[in-house]
Amino acid sequence: VIATTPGMSYQRPAEAMKMLLKARHLSPTYGGKTPVAPEAEDMMVMSEVPDIFHAGHIHVTDIDSYRGTLVVNSGAWQSQTGFQQTMGITPSPGIAVVVNLATLQPFKRDFNHQRQVP
């Protein structure tokens, strides 16, 4: 979605995740690099609205919300790889997202400096 949608950025993955929520599908594009199995039922369709939508493929921490759904993209525990450098992706290693499940309030915890990130 990021590579094929104008205005999307690898540094703001939550924006792409919100597009997936709007489309109600985890793989809304056909063809390209994402293989889609020819099954009788499309298992990538979001039939129910999730409370939390979590991903983390590109190693950049990002938090947002969309129509009551908490959107969380996890970072990583490693620094920038050569591939990420060629793609212009700057990961955010060592930052974990913790969610209070009673309130759905997210918090970032920076393990690089052992402090909470605003």
Please tell me what each predicted stretch does.
Residues 1-118:
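Extended recognition/assembly regions associated with phosphoester-bond processing machinery
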